[in-house]
């Protein structure tokens, strides 16, 4: 599994496509446009570039205020797997808010886990690493965040 890292980067260091993606996201969140197609057209960005970067680039103020993170986790269907995963999250000091698990199909289950990270005692990168280090974890993705 690839290790996910998070960085704080000055705006002038971002590629043009990344900067335009941020502009398009700002238009959408402010309600100045209703559709992605309108936003990318207004900022002069292709839809494919927008979709490439939209889930991976955020303004710093948006991340700094985020407390609740939602993860999508693919697990192998083995006894005790979910319990091990929840223990890893709880051991960081994070507060588990919601857990949704699909019925295991073909030996795999998907878990959606919402976590309050305000009380967390480690770096978010470390949390990702610990979850991904579980032998039964096949994939961990951050699918959303909010306050």
Swiss-Prot record:
Coiled-coil positions: none
PROSITE patterns in the cross-refs: ACT
Domain ACT: 70-145
Domain of life: Bacteria
Gene3D superfamilies the UniProt entry points to: 3.30.70.260
Family under the similarity heading: Belongs to the UPF0735 family.
Name this protein carries in UniProt: UPF0735 ACT domain-containing protein ABC1543
Species annotation: Shouchella clausii (strain KSM-K16) (Alkalihalobacillus clausii)
């Amino acid at each position: 599994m690839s290790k996910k890292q998070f960085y704080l980067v000055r705006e002038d260091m971002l590629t043009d496509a990344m900067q335009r993606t941020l502009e398009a996201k700002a238009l959408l969140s402010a309600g100045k446009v209703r559709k992605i197609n309108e936003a990318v057209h207004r900022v002069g960005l292709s839809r494919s570039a927008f979709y490439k970067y939209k889930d991976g680039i955020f303004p710093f103020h948006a991340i700094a205020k985020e407390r609740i993170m939602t993860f999508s986790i693919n697990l192998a269907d083995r006894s005790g797997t979910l319990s091990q995963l929840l223990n890893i999250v709880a051991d960081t000091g994070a507060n588990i808010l919601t857990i949704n698990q699909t019925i295991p199909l073909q030996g795999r289950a998907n878990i959606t886990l919402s976590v309050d990270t305000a009380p967390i005692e480690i770096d978010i990168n470390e949390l990702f690493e610990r979850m991904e280090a579980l032998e039964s974890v096949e994939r961990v993705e951050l699918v959303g965040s909010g306050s």
